[in-house]
Amino acid sequence: MGHNQPMQSSNPQEHFVQIALDIEHRLTTPISLTSDSNQRRNQWVTIIICTILAVTGQCIARLLENYYFLHKNLSRRRGILTQTLLQVVGFPILLLPFLLHFLIKKQKQLLIFSGETSLKHLAITYSILCIYMFCQAFFSDVRNQIPYRVFTLTYTTQLLFTLIFSKYYNDIKFNRWTFISLILAVLAGAFTLYTFSAGSPIYGKKSYGYGIINVAFGAAIFFSLLLCIIRKVFEELISFCNTSTNRKQPSFVVVLEMIIFLSLVVTIILVAAVLISGEHHDMKKEMETFTKGDIAYVRTMVGQAVAWQIYWVGIVGLVFAVSAVFSNVISVCTWPIVSLLVAFLYNTHDHFDVFRGIALGAAALSVSCYIYIIHKEKSDDDDQSTS
């Protein structure tokens, strides 16, 4: 979970990016108390901003994905690797803030990829992300071959997997509020099963087998494992900075570093897969046959790439600032919002019903419970530091 550590910099402009994760018992001088108060406030601001980014990014990406499938004339089976590639190929937009940080701070080396974190965990992170992306590609192909309610119930299991992996990899302690939050998040995801798919248009019902369901389980497992391994890398970096006398606590820029380098490697692999499979020939055909025109096609693809990067900054930022569990809760609790927006924009005859209301209410309560957990932990830390 996210914790507090004294700030190493006195520049007020650095408060947003300087998010400490570890707790140490400090002397309760007026200066330290003021610093802790500012640090807590800035961490809350960061959590709020990352939550907004995660929700906004996922909503825009799914809406544009729906728009893409509604107006393409080619077979749905075409372009599955391309759609997966869009989730990572937009990373160059993060290079500008990343490089500006290095220029302004005059930083000479990377933090995560400079040998200060375990190469084993970095290798696992790369492997898990690659497997997850290919699962997403196959999952995109078979999603509508199973009833949407089956898909939703299967995919919400990622919350359970995140809970298990966080306990094993991150050694997180849970309380009753954690389980209440997760139960409400599962309900939020489960009650969207009575609505249509929030990521692509509905197709006719088809027979499905256990192999297809296993693909959905695989995507859920690897996404959960990915978040927990990323958290483990961040924890190792924090531990290194704590034991090193000449190292400041890592700032939010490590989130950009993590996303950029992971996306770079996966992009290269997926581009190679697209070229080998011949999907790059389909892109020109899709552009020519797109019912809204080639300009709309390009805007849709670019918009998805940018939206996914916004989503990843929010999700990985929440992993850095809080935990993998909270990050996944936010991801799942966005589904009812996406479902409502899709109904409003693409299916106007589909009215707001009791199931959508329950899903939205459960999502709001789930997030509120976890925010209460964070607030309570910080209050307990304050009591310990003043005692």
UniProtKB/Swiss-Prot annotation:
The keyword Transport applies. Keywords: Membrane, Transmembrane, Transmembrane helix, Transport. Its main location: membrane. InterPro entries: PUP_plant. The chain crosses the membrane at residues 44-64, 84-104, 122-142, 150-169, 179-199, 210-230, 252-272, 306-326, 329-349, 354-374. It comes from the Eukaryota. It is found in: Membrane. GO terms for molecular function: purine nucleobase transmembrane transporter activity; purine nucleoside transmembrane transporter activity. This is Putative purine permease 15. It comes from Arabidopsis thaliana. The gene is PUP15.
